[in-house]
Swiss-Prot record:
Pathway: tRNA modification; tRNA-queuosine biosynthesis
UniProt cross-references to InterPro entries, sorted A to Z: GTP-CH-I_C/QueF, NADPH_dep_7-cyano-7-deazaG_red, QueF, QueF_type1
A GO cellular component entry from the record: cytoplasm
GO molecular function: preQ1 synthase activity
Assigned keywords, A-Z: Cytoplasm, NADP, Oxidoreductase, Queuosine biosynthesis
Sites where the protein binds substrate: 72-74, 91-92
Keyword Acetylation: no
Listed EC numbers: 1.7.1.13
Catalytic residues identified in the record: 50, 57
This protein's name: NADPH-dependent 7-cyano-7-deazaguanine reductase
Length: 136
């Protein structure tokens, strides 16, 4: 492969980058609307950038929710989460934005988002956000 061809392929967004950039949360119909149940999703490789330093921040996201009429499609959720990797955003803002999007798209009965950020500079941070009313 020539150097010119290699340089050319790195200048435009690659197909994976385009898919991530265009991603949005997709939901499908809850297969059992009559039953109250919980779904837990782990996303252990979340990244965004610190808005002050530009350094990467890493976190494990845990989503637990009780679906109402819709259920989150996992691949779309993964791609949506990957879209934050190059965005300079605070921990508080990104977790609230993700929660807003989850609530607006899925309309769950109840949802809990936990974000456990890896330590940086000897400081770690964990955020927990809840929305809705948990049902028994």
């Amino acid at each position: 492969m020539s150097t010119a061809k290699l340089e050319d392929s790195t200048q435009r967004p690659l197909y994976g980058e385009r898919i991530i950039e265009e991603s949005k949360i997709i939901c499908f119909d809850n297969p059992n609307k009559k039953r109250i149940y919980e779904i837990s999703i782990q996303l252990p490789e979340f990244t965004c950038k610190c808005p002050f330093s530009g350094y990467p921040d890493f976190a494990k996201l845990n989503i637990t929710y009780q679906p109402n009429l819709k259920v989150y499609e996992l691949k779309s959720l993964k791609l949506y989460i990957n879209n934050f990797r190059d965005i300079k955003i605070s921990h508080e803002e990104v977790v609230n934005r993700i929660m807003d999007d989850l609530v607006n798209e899925g309309l769950p009965h109840w949802i809990h988002l936990n974000a456990a950020f890896n330590p940086r500079g000897n400081v770690s941070m964990q955020l927990d956000i809840f929305s809705g009313q948990k049902r028994n």
